[in-house]
Amino acid sequence: MSLGEINENVKLAREYALLGNYSSAVVCYQGVLEQIKKYLYSVRDSSLQQKWQQVWQEINEETKQVREIMTTLESFQMESTPSKPSSFAQDNDIMPVHVEHRSSPCVVRKSSVPYKDSKGHGNRLSVGPRGQARPSPRVANGDKGKPQKSKEKKENPSKPKEDKNKAEAVETEVKRFDRGGEDKDLIDALERDIISQNPNVTWDDIADLEEAKKLLKEAVVLPMWMPEFFKGIRRPWKGVLMVGPPGTGKTLLAKAVATECRTTFFNVSSSTLTSKYRGESEKLVRLLFEMARFYAPTTIFIDEIDSICSRRGTSEEHEASRRVKAELLVQMDGVGGTSENDPSKMVMVLAATNFPWDIDEALRRRLEKRIYIPLPSAKGRVDLLKINLKELDLANDVNMDKIAEQMEGYSGADITNVCRDASLMAMRRRIEGLTPEEIRNLPKDEMHMPTTMEDFETALKKVSKSVSAADLEKYEKWIAEFGSC
């Protein structure tokens, strides 16, 4: 995809709109908006991003105008059949022009007047070149067609402005990975795993875990800000493994990395790198890392990495699975060479697992930083309660410190479940014993009752912790032996 293609697609969309083929114009406009979105993700310069965002807004405004025209025309079509008798009676001065148009060679094939009226806007491509014949469908519809014409004229002056903005924005080709040949489908599949939309999770949305956030900033953010410092022995970390029980915020940390760090972010799972065809899974792994180096700086997030690269040499291991693991290990070892000389071209693998003891030893060595994501501390539990309850009305008797004390041993996901259950208690009390019709007629104010301390105590009795003490002991033992914080 090049800037020339974007420009041509914009021209094509406007030509369709001017000729009255609005459905095709909308399709072209949508394609242009998607192309600009993809290009925006590859732009690193903030001023350049603002210009392209302005271009996107203007193109989007044109699309809305074309949609409004389509809606107006559809309403005309719906009204055309019932309004026909009254139009003969009231619009006598317009009908002679309509009859003259029927004698035109281009429209003589039409079987009836209502059919021609309903299709008039779709025939402009064939009628347009005949000069005087083109405006006749608008005259046939009376004055309703005039605002439509003025909208098309308004779009025309904006065209030079759009082209000027595009020319000033960037004059280079759009950066896109392309190896051609039979790998194109595999590349397209991997490109779908590039997160182009903001997950909207910031560091402040994650309670506690200060050490983990500090390490991730050091591994991803600081090398971008201080490339001269992170060289040689101080090169950026090429692999980080997050270990911990379920529901402690490992995936949430990855979302924060995608939001806060201006790097290309690949979200990869076992389904992404698995194929039923022999040799294709290894090829997907190789292409993933080639694309990562091409779009560098890049972060590859592999969730539940134990499902992809479990321990080799076991009796349950399949030969195809072993080949995929070998390719992944080879590619990860090759990642470091691309970032040692230029930290801005780094590729970092960020992995998460609930079963660190099942991971292959060679992969454990390549994931240089192995950090423990523990259950929330007392302060972390209070912070989590504040984050989860910030949109709720709380009664005066709610004591968050006391609630946090009763939640010792709960994971972050468990605390969220308690808050969700407590927030529904008032609604459950209000609708108890009511019929469905009475529930539908309840005022909204009565549904938004403050959440009380009693609601939290009831929710705590219903929601138990999901992590056992034996599991915590296993994690702590593993991190004490293999951890690298």
From Swiss-Prot:
It is an enzyme of class 5 (isomerase). ATP binds at residues 244-251. Its main location: cytoplasm. One of its GO terms (biological process) is cytoplasmic microtubule organization. The keyword Cell cycle applies. The keyword Transmembrane does not apply. Residues 101-173 are annotated as: Disordered. Its EC number is 5.6.1.1. Keywords: ATP-binding, Cell cycle, Cell division, Cytoplasm, Cytoskeleton, Isomerase, Microtubule, Mitosis, Nucleotide-binding. It is found in: Cytoplasm; Cytoplasm, Cytoskeleton, Microtubule organizing center, Centrosome; Cytoplasm, Cytoskeleton, Spindle pole; Cytoplasm, Cytoskeleton, Spindle. SUPFAM superfamilies: P-loop containing nucleoside triphosphate hydrolases. ATPase activity is stimulated by microtubules, which promote homooligomerization. ATP-dependent microtubule severing is stimulated by interaction with katnb1. Residues 141-173 have a biased composition (Basic and acidic residues). Transmembrane segments: none annotated. It catalyses: n ATP + n H2O + a microtubule = n ADP + n phosphate + (n+1) alpha/beta tubulin heterodimers. CDD domains: Kp60-NTD, RecA-like_KTNA1. It comes from the Eukaryota. GO terms for molecular function: ATP binding; ATP hydrolysis activity; microtubule binding; microtubule severing ATPase activity. GO terms for cellular component: centrosome; cytoplasm; microtubule; microtubule cytoskeleton; midbody; mitotic spindle pole; spindle; spindle pole. Catalytic subunit of a complex which severs microtubules in an ATP-dependent manner. Microtubule severing may promote rapid reorganization of cellular microtubule arrays and the release of microtubules from the centrosome following nucleation. Belongs to the AAA ATPase family. Katanin p60 subunit A1 subfamily. Can homooligomerize into hexameric rings, which may be promoted by interaction with microtubules. Interacts with katnb1, which may serve as a targeting subunit. This is Katanin p60 ATPase-containing subunit A1. It comes from Danio rerio. The lineage of its organism: Eukaryota, Metazoa, Chordata, Craniata, Vertebrata.
